[in-house]
Amino acid sequence: DDVALYFSGQEWEILEKWQKQMYKQEMKTNYQTLDSLGYAFSKPDLITWMEQGRMLFISEQGCLDKTRRTTSPPTDEQLDMKDTGKLPCFDHEGTLRTKEEDCRLNGPQKQDLGAALPGKERKILSARRDTFQSPSLQETEIPNKKVSITASDPDKKDLRHKPRETPGRLEIPTGPRCYSCYVCRKVFQVRRDLLKHKRSHSKSQLRRYPKYRNTSRGKSELRRTQRLLCQKKRFQCSECEKSYFLKGSLVTHQVVHTGQRPYPCPECDKTFRYRANLKKHLCLHRGERPFCCGECGRAFVQQCELTEHLRLHSGEKPFQCPQCDRCFRLKRGMKVHLSQHSGKRPFHCPECGRSFSRKAALKTHQRTHSEEKPFSCDECGRKFIYKIKLDEHIRVHTGEKPFSCPECNKSFRLKRSLKAHGLQHSGKRPFQCPECSRGFFWRNAMRAHQRLHSEQKPFPCAECGKRFTRPSKLACHTRVHDRQKEFPCGECKKTFSQQSRLTQHLKVHNTEKPFSCAECGRSFRRRAHLTEHTRLHSGEEPFQCPECDKSFSWKASMKFHQRMHRDEKPFACSECGKTYTHQSQLTEHLRLHSGEKPYQCPECQKTFRLKGNLKSHLLQHSGQKPFSCVMCGKSFTQQYRLTEHIRVHSGEKPFQCPECDKSYCIRGSLKVHLYTHSGERPFQCPECGKGFLQKRSLKAHLCLHSGERPFSCDECGRSFTYVGALKTHIAVHAKEKPSSL
């Protein structure tokens, strides 16, 4: 193809300094090359201009043509160079020629030149001799350069040719057509991408360039900008008083207030405010997700969604807060964050008056008042207000724990649990009470603690008027009043607060239990559960703690125990500040403050705070004592009672007093002993003020005031206040029986 490269005055101004230097060097190199080959021609004007330091651009009236292809260095007989009006142009090898060198070849020289070329090249040359002399040229564009092609060759009229690159010479792009940004020189293969990229430049940047000002778009935009700068935002929304320059922008905005959704989905009847949103939604029904992540394979409907997702892998956070320099991955995340600095919360809940910075957050909050729970679990049927809560709940069924601690490789189901765990490694408690400077891992725990200082209890019970600091405590308390409203199990009389939990519980009774224990006859649905149960009878403890060599029957018990070595107690009581290693321990502890006793004995209606206490109590009614000592045959209702009893035979006393080095086999005995050193008597009689070390001593003392004698002899019917007195009395009857015989 025939290409002639030249620079106009405007283009010469756009060129960078290094590009101008390269152009000058290229021109000098080409001139020296021709001169060394012995060509007879006068010095071109371009070289003269460079020596004189003049501007090196060509007026747009100048006509530059492309030369023939160079085969071998021509001789003086083949070319007779004229010294008329030399203008620079390039062949496909990048060699400098002049218009007369290539266009004004005399008759015999033309024949010699044609003879020196191959047949194909000779045909091309003969077909285009008239073209080189023709002044009628048509211009088209490639990025930042102008290319002249011959109008007399109709087959090549729309062809955009880019010569191949030559080392050390001016580079002209090759391959498919490219589109260049004239502000930053970035190149794009698709015109649409270039238009999108231009939006990243401010209008002030674009208006600096003559090429932009000369385009119709630039002129219209300049006129529009000047018009907008000279006028105010005349179109104001009557609802929120927001103003706009254009009426069309106001009409688009008002759809938000009217609630109008004129674009319905034909598949699911969902409606949309804008047609573009409907088109995106239809891609979901068609299953079209054309934008795929190369890292994890996840597919998206829109390119912008993929772009946002890729920042997860790259860690890029391009949006920075101007107030605190905090960075965000998404622009909307930064907008939400900015509302914290401004303090603006324009969206108010009509039910409770709570304010929100986003309308979407208000809508989600209103579900708490309407009790709408649109997200349900397919496994257990439990429903949730928020989708993120459903996603977290599903991990309970799948067992997935995607958040791993880099320090100890421990995994967590929730990200916030990992954050709280990480604070234990660092020892930081980021939330401090301003009153007493006490630290907390959680903001909610600190807020609940602050209510203790202010004595604020904003949550009253509707039945009895008792007030609580937290809604969770109120919920626990209301169970006492609502026991008749609970859902009881017809098989075992167990009650549940929700129908879904009762349904889940009924599966225990309805399913078969083919695996039975040979010792006690208890049945299980799974063999693994039976295996774990038999360890109670055999005393097998296969799981050993690597820290203290203590053994356990279950792996979960060992993990639970290991937290004690790590001093890991992430669950804190907001009332008294006591910490626990497990959530269930905290739940049981909170019942001390609320006074709740949710477990009731069906035989005597006695209530208990802990489920384990109820189970032990039921064994008294049934008379069962499943845990027997192999040494003396004594039986116990609970495992820990047997463990304490075995220490009597072994002589083990693991609990030692730090004051007097006295040792005990039971932890409770050590606690009572420590009161003797401190002088504390925690259990006081409300009648006479007398103090006692143990609770059972106080109960026995209260019988003196009430006159009650709960312990009676079966032989003679005599009653006693203390169980010890009854045992002494029974021994008297035992001694009398042999003598009477």
UniProtKB/Swiss-Prot annotation:
Disulfide bonds: none
Name of protein: Zinc finger protein 425
Cellular component aspect of the GO annotation: cytoplasm; nucleus
Lineage: Eukaryota, Metazoa, Chordata, Craniata, Vertebrata
Chain intervals for the UniProt region annotation (Disordered): 67-86, 128-169
Zinc finger (C2H2-type) in chain: 179-201, 235-257, 263-285, 291-313, 319-341, 347-369, 375-397, 403-425, 431-453, 459-481, 487-509, 515-537, 543-565, 571-593, 599-621, 627-649, 655-677, 683-705, 711-733
Family per record: Belongs to the krueppel C2H2-type zinc-finger protein family.
InterPro entries noted in UniProt: KRAB (IPR001909), KRAB_dom_sf (IPR036051), Krueppel_C2H2_ZnFinger (IPR050826), Znf_C2H2_sf (IPR036236), Znf_C2H2_type (IPR013087)
This protein's UniProt keywords: Cytoplasm, DNA-binding, Metal-binding, Nucleus, Repeat, Transcription, Transcription regulation, Zinc, Zinc-finger
Polar residues bias: start-end ranges: 132-151
GO molecular function: DNA binding; zinc ion binding
